[in-house]
């Protein structure tokens, strides 16, 4: 399954650092504003799918309150976007709100939650929020992020970060209403538990388990370890494992699948080289969405889940070679190139189908002066697949963020 509203680059790179219990809960108010200009162009080189072009000017306003009497507070975020352009199948781009076969701008209260401070390292939140956990991660790869209606408890016990989540609704990117999770006309709810621990030697471990009542059950494990090689060089080993089964009749069939990803990332000076292998086992491709991407826009936390493809099809194996370069002569400029090759895919018509994706990215963040806080980013993808359409895709993004107080 493809999640065509894919995650930003930083999710895959930072997959081992997602859990952060509020060890020192902030007690000062803050107001942050982020302006994002987003251009999207997807060209289907063959098949019946309609090409799409979309552009938006988005606004995100984040307010965080202090804790009244050191106990209770309220945070809120406004998400909005104005339509600049929309052509072809832009209703499927995720950049703008779909209105039948057309698109339009939108505004929504993307976050609005009460927060209760229960000690120095424990916080309870209830309401709409943008989540960033391995099994429930709100995507921010378009104009504004997706969001989840939930109750979330974060705590730290003996150096272990722990969390528990209950959720009954979600809103996809560019959606203005939160919809209940449902399948086959029946509604259900999500329950998740997770945690992580970082050792003094750099070893990081994470685990999470989630259940969608009578629909789907998922487990996630992650281990990462950095080796210091001398002369400033380092090697990061990062392993991810997913396992999923149906949880009852709502899934519609018996389902069992697993996914394993192992990456080695070698850094020397301004250059980082990564080699990543991924394999899918079980009876089917790996399904990581809690509702088939209707409203939950979850992301897959592996290196081989890239701009367009996830390389998570039935029995698929994939290998990625990636290079990242920080241009020392131009502070703030970073470049990335990667190629991912998938094979052994089982489909209705092939027992050994192949697919491949090549990505090029460039990003520049202004370092000083009046433009400090502005970043410019270009993302290019070239996709060839024997099970999906061949695609060329361009995304151009300008972000400008600043703190009001």
Question: For each predicted feature, which ranges?
Answer:
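C-terminal structural cap/anchor segments
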Residues: 284-350, 357-367
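Beta-barrel outer-membrane channel/assembly domains of diderm bacteria
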Residues: 11, 15-128, 155, 325-328, ...
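Membrane-embedded beta-strands of outer-membrane beta-barrel proteins
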Residues: 61, 112-114, 151-153, 162, ...
């Amino acid at each position: 399954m493809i999640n065509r509203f894919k995650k930003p680059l930083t999710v895959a790179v930072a997959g081992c650092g997602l859990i952060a219990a509020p060890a020192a809960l902030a007690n000062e108010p803050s107001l942050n504003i982020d302006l994002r200009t987003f251009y999207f162009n997807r060209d289907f080189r063959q098949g019946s799918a309609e090409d799409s072009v979309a552009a938006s000017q988005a606004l995100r306003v984040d307010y965080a309150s202090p804790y009244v009497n050191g106990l209770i507070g309220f945070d809120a975020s406004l998400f909005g976007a104005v339509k600049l352009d929309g052509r072809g199948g832009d209703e499927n781009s995720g950049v703008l709100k779909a209105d039948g076969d057309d698109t339009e701008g939108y505004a929504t209260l993307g976050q609005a939650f009460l927060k209760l401070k229960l000690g120095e390292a424990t916080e309870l939140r209830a309401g709409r929020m943008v989540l960033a956990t391995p099994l429930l991660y709100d995507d921010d790869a378009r104009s504004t992020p997706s969001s989840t209606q939930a109750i979330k408890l974060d705590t730290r016990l003996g150096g272990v970060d722990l969390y528990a989540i209950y959720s009954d609704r979600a809103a996809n990117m560019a959606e203005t209403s939160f919809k209940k999770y449902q399948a086959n006309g029946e509604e259900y709810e999500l329950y998740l538990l997770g945690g992580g621990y970082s050792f003094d030697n750099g070893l990081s471990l994470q685990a999470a388990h989630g259940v969608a009542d009578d629909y789907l059950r998922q487990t996630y494990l992650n281990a990462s370890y950095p080796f210091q090689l001398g002369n400033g060089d380092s090697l990061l080993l990062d392993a991810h494992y997913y396992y999923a089964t149906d949880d009852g009749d709502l899934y519609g069939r018996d389902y069992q699948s697993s996914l394993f990803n192992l990456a080695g990332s070698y850094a020397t000076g301004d250059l980082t080289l990564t080699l990543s292998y991924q394999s899918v086992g079980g009876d089917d491709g790996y399904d990581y969405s809690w509702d088939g991407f209707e409203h939950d826009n979850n992301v897959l936390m592996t290196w081989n889940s890239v701009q367009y493809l996830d390389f998570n099809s039935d029995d698929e194996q994939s290998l990625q070679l990636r290079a990242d370069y920080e241009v020392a002569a131009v502070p703030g400029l970073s470049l990335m190139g990667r190629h991912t090759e998938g094979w052994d895919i089982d489909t209705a018509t092939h027992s050994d189908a192949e697919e491949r994706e090549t990505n090029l990215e460039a990003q520049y963040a202004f370092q000083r002066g009046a433009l400090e806080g502005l970043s410019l980013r270009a993302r290019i993808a070239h996709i060839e697949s024997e099970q999906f359409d061949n695609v060329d895709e361009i995304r151009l993004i300008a972000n400008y963020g600043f703190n009001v107080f």
